[in-house]
A protein has these predicted regions:
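C-terminal helix/juxtamembrane-tail motif
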Residues: 240, 244-261
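Non-catalytic interface/linker regions that flank or bridge core catalytic/transmembrane domains
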Residues: 1-45, 49, 56, 261
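Exposed alpha-helical structural elements
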Residues: 27-30, 49, 53, 187, ...
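Surface-exposed polar/charged interaction patches
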Residues: 38, 57-60, 227, 253, ...
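Intrinsic-disorder-associated interaction segments
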Residues: 21, 40-43, 47, 214, ...
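Divalent metal-dependent catalytic cores for phosphoryl transfer on phosphate-bearing substrates
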Residues: 65-241
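Active-site flanking loop/helix segments enriched in acidic
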Residues: 35-71, 150-158
Length: 261
């Protein structure tokens, strides 16, 4: 099974064409401001409820699966459990990594919920999927944003970059806002924040903006991505009662309280 095979004139192509058009530096910052510390959008919801909401969500940017996102969540977690049976936190990370896609309940379009992420505020690298469509982005010809570093300084660190907005950043903000209500450590919060940052962790772009220590984050993300991406090859996967019960108990352990979203 060939994964991440992006062809033109497909639903994925038209999705990215729209995402690349609207996600300018200015617009992305307006969304980050809206959702920073969850802004005014604060609802009470358990992690179980958020996972259940993925039962009816299919990622329109993904050419590799037409399954609901909840199936992919359990697939990823189970593949991790087979290789790391004692690493409970990594299993939980596999299960929850896409739960930021609940953004759709706030009326956000798919172009602000799913898809690969990339840096705004500097030159767009050709490692971005459907790179040619980046020419529709107003920042493409903006002299302030079209140099290698743009508004950033060399080696400023990936945590100081502004990435296109979507479910990664939103779930990261949820976890940050709810510190003390869960047991997810910084290592796995970073994996969640950067797991869709394919131009960086797979395309090896933006290395001039990395600071010492960022290579550790990259290694962690790449390791996680092996489970996130390749779990989709298991087309016969079935969520059994045992699987559901195992992860229910695991989520209760790592998320003992209701979260603000």
């Amino acid at each position: 099974m060939q994964l991440r095979n992006y062809l033109t004139e497909t639903p994925q192509y038209h999705f990215y064409k729209e995402q690349h058009r609207i996600q300018t530096y200015e617009y992305v910052n307006s969304k980050i401001k809206q959702y920073h510390n969850l802004g005014n959008v604060k609802i009470d919801m358990s992690i179980h409820r958020a996972l259940h909401m993925m039962d009816s969500f299919v990622d329109p940017s993904d050419p590799d699966t037409s399954s609901s996102n909840s199936v992919h969540a359990y697939q990823t977690a189970e593949r991790i459990r087979k290789q790391y049976p004692d690493d409970k936190e990594m299993q939980v990370c596999g299960l929850i990594h896409d739960l930021g896609k609940v953004l759709y309940i706030f009326g956000e379009p798919s172009s602000l919920v799913v898809g690969d992420t990339y840096v705004v505020g500097c030159k767009f690298p050709q490692s971005i999927v459907y790179y040619d469509t980046m020419k529709d982005n107003a920042d493409f010809i903006n002299p302030l944003y079209s140099t290698e570093c743009g508004i950033y300084t060399p080696n400023c660190g990936i945590e100081n970059l502004t990435l296109s907005f979507g479910h990664d950043e939103y779930l990261y903000q949820v976890l940050q806002y709810n510190q003390g209500k869960h047991r997810i450590t910084d290592k796995f919060q970073q994996i969640i924040r950067f797991h869709s940052f394919y131009p960086w962790h797979t395309g090896k772009s933006y290395t001039h903006l990395m600071k010492p220590g960022d290579e550790v984050i990259m290694r962690n993300v790449i390791n996680f991505n092996n489970f996130d991406l390749y779990s989709k090859e298991d087309t016969e996967f079935v969520i059994t009662t045992e699987i559901r019960e195992y992860y229910k108990n695991l989520l209760d352990e790592y998320f003992p309280e209701i979260l603000k979203w």
